[in-house]
Amino acid sequence: MEQAWRWYGPKDPVSLSDIRQAGATGIVTALHHIPNGEIWRIEEIKKRKTEIENAGLSWSVVESVPVHEEIKTQTGNYQKWINNYKQTLRNLAQCGIDTVCYNFMPVLDWTRTDLAYELPDGSKALRFDHIAFAAFELHILKRPDAEKAYNQEEQVAARTYYDKMSAQDITQLTRNIIAGLPGAEEGYTLDEFQTQLDRYKDISSEKFRTHLAYFLNEIVPVAQEVGIKMAIHPDDPPRPILGLPRIVSTIEDMQWFVETQPLPANGFTMCTGSYGVRSDNDLVKMIEQFADRIYFAHLRSTQREDNPLTFHKAAHLEGDVDMFNVVKALLNEEYRRLNQGETRLIPMRPDHGHQMLDDLRKKTNPGYSAIGRLKGLAEFRGLEMALKKVYFNK
């Protein structure tokens, strides 16, 4: 696999030099300074690509070209944003970039309740606390009909949790959930957030699928024409939240996805940490069933807690994800492609490392500190080497 690393551009505390020293060769990045929906101009793409190449690295994957909210709701200027998206793909292809990761999650990108959950060894991780999230929905945001999403026991636990919160706790939880995270291009106040949610009140999962289908049927033929592989990222977490439709969460969703738009350019980002939160998702089966459509891998593991809807980021080779067999399945597909004459390795990046060691004293992007990902990348490099020696180099 191609060892890649997510970089948030010139303002990222982790520099390109740091990344190269970590052993990565590919960069996963985006033009974060361009507003959602606007065209990425060739000169802007080339400027960023040159910056990366001057550091001895290559721009391997775009993550992400954001999908404008009006595309998701099919309102306003959605056709304009789709046309802009097509032009961005053409411009990326002209600059030699061939893989685009994106998501179709409504309103929020990945969501956590705690961005600095302390583990027993003193390192810090991202965490999603189901009851804390319920307290936010029911008692801070006060989302209409939110109680329908929780049983009586959960509602009581959420009330108890909320009653113990200080004003600072409420502010911090709210900020964690709605103020925006790396990769989520927009942040919201509470009122703005509820306004965004209200735009989906009449959009069921079935209707949302028709919106995604329309987007795919507009975009994927262009990607196919210009040689770009589109790799949709799963919902994170992979279940309904905030009354919003979530339609990229299961193997059944993946099957619908490829049947809806069967062109080869229409593929997946295999994010083991997102899909793996659900105990009913068999990651190895997913990889094997859709192997030829996996164009990018996010490798991380999560640990479900006593409440199985609560989870935190585990060490990369620990937790609930069977990383040994996940990586083996990805290598099986990579070798199949190589044997058929393809030369492009599957780009992989270590996702959401723990904040540890010297990074505990630094300001970092949540989930994207250097040392935790350095550790993860080294572990994956070793795992891949061992698997290749035992199973593939015969």
From Swiss-Prot:
Family under the similarity heading: Belongs to the mannonate dehydratase family.
Enzyme class: lyase
Organism: Haemophilus influenzae (strain PittEE)
Catalytic activity: D-mannonate = 2-dehydro-3-deoxy-D-gluconate + H2O
Its EC number(s): 4.2.1.8
Cofactor: Fe(2+); Mn(2+)
GO molecular function, one term: ferrous iron binding
UniProt protein name: Mannonate dehydratase
Database matches in InterPro entries: Man_deHydtase, Xyl_isomerase-like_sf
Primary gene name: uxuA
